Amino acid sequence: MRMNFSTVLLGSSVALAAVSGAQAADAIVAAEPEPMDYVRVCDAFGIGYFYIPGTETCLKINGYARFQVSFGPDEVNKRQGWGAQGTSDWDAFSRAYIAFSAKSDTELGTLTGFFASEFNADNDSDVGDSLINLDEAYIQLGGFKAGFFYSWWDKGLNGETDSLANITEFNSIAYLYEGGAFQAGVAINELEGATTKANGIGVQGIVSATVGGVSIDLLGGYDTEVEEGAIRALVSAELGPGVFQIAGVWASDPNVYFAASEWTVATSYRYNATEKLAITPGLHYWGDYGFVSDADQWRGGLAVDYKITSGLASRVSVQYTSRDIGADTEDFVSGFVRLQRDF
């Protein structure tokens, strides 16, 4: 009996060991973690781009947060379009701006997709804090560009004194040839809503050249809805510790590109006092203002920029304007104080 019991015990132990071994063979083993595809810096298109994981597309996200207090006659009306509802001569508002730029190399050149939007708040009301604006949205391949974007008329002088254009943003198709120091381009703009007429387009053309520290832009635009046009020249030159600029515009009659006067000339000088401080005085004169003979307007002012710290800057603008349209004369001071955090 003792012999049989030992035999049974030994057999049971062998069986248990076999079952245990079989269970161990069938056990689930955790897989080794796959290496993470960390975000990589993309330096092919400038600072701030990174590769979208798993692609060869580079993405940049940037923007700013701004607080500004503006002052001038009926400033609230001008900014918000409230008409008789508001008569304050000062206005505080805040803005958030964010932009996304996606770029990749192709056999046809650099492919870009760009989107930017503004979120504005003038006060705590359903009207004032819901001012969302699509700033730009376009596709660009090499020199070809299509979408909603700022035209070449949007370029102005340094400072805050000049006003050298009328409407500057359109749904457009444009092509810009860039040959080093020389550029030439043409654009077709949709004008729907710009006038009371229909089915018209705007055509722009630009030629630019840079020689040393001097650059020259020659720009023209023709509005087919009103059959009028405008031409503009703008010169920038590095001069001493700053940049001198001068520009002139002539228009055949009011049109989508320029509608303030028959002719105008403006100038400014940005003086870089230190690495943080820049001072920009400016002058602007409009002849035949409002396309009325012998009517004129002039403006003189100063803009001061100060870099408080990395990513945080301020700007103060003070402008004096004098307008003379026959018996209608007006003199006023306007400007703003701005604080902006860029990222």
Swiss-Prot record:
Transmembrane residue ranges: none
Protein name: Putative outer membrane protein y4fJ
Signal peptide coordinates: 1-17
UniProt keyword GTP-binding present: no
UniProt keyword Transmembrane, yes or no: yes
Membrane topology: Peripheral membrane protein
Pfam families: Porin_2 (PF02530)
UniProt similarity note: Belongs to the alphaproteobacteria porin family.
Protein function: May act as an outer membrane pore.
GO biological process, alphabetically ordered: monoatomic ion transport
Keywords: Cell outer membrane, Ion transport, Membrane, Plasmid, Porin, Signal, Transmembrane, Transmembrane beta strand, Transport
SUPFAM superfamilies: Porins (SSF56935)
GO cellular component: cell outer membrane; pore complex
Main location: membrane
Compartments it resides in: Cell outer membrane
Gene Ontology molecular function terms on file: porin activity
